[in-house]
Amino acid sequence: SSLCSYIYGYRNDYQGIINFDETNIKAYSVKQWVELRKHSLSMLFQDLRIFTELTAIENIRLKNNLTGYKTRKEVLALFEALGLSDKLNVKAGKLSFGQQQRVAFIRSLCQPFDFIFLDEPISHLDDDNAHIMEELVTGEAKKQGAGIIVTSIGKHIELKYDRILKL
C-alpha cells in the first residue's frame, strides 16, 4: 500500500527519488497531479474508496463522467463479466466486500492510463472472479500499451509479470 501511495502521489514521507517522465514527483503541482491521475495513472485502492451511499453504477459514472473513457455499453459489459449486472442499482454499502472490490476495479478501468496500480486487488475475491479480473486488466493494459503494478502480501493475482520484487 505504501509503495502505491508514494507512486500515486498520496504520500511523500519517503526518502529517495521517484521519477515519472524524468521528473521528480515531489516537484509536481496539484494541477500536474490532477492531470496525471486523469490521463496517466489509475489506482485500485486496497481500501476501495467507493461511495457507499451511491449505487454501484453511480460510483462508476462519477469516474467515467470525468474521463469519458468508456461507453455505457463497455461499462455494462464489465459489470456483466464480473457477475454484477444485477447489482447496478444497489447501494454500494449494501454490497459484499468482494462485490465492492469488483466495482472499484471497474472504476479503475474507466480512464486512460500509462500505469495501473492494483493494491491487494483480489484479496476478497473467489478464484473465478480473480481470473476474470486478471483477464480484464491484462486486456485493458495491452490495449492502452500500459504497465501494471501490483502489490500483494496475501492472495496473488496471476499475471505474466516482467519482474517480481519482494520488499
Where in this protein do the model-derived segments appear?
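ABC ATPase NBD coupling module
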Residues: 25-42
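Hydrophobic anchor residue at the start of the ABC signature
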Residues: 105
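Conserved ABC transporter NBD signature motif
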Residues: 16-26
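Conserved ABC ATPase "signature" region
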Residues: 72-87
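Catalytic Walker B motif of ABC-type/P-loop ATPase nucleotide-binding domains
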Residues: 116-120
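Helix-to-loop junction immediately C-terminal to a conserved catalytic motif
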Residues: 8
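Conserved ABC ATPase signature
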Residues: 91-95, 99
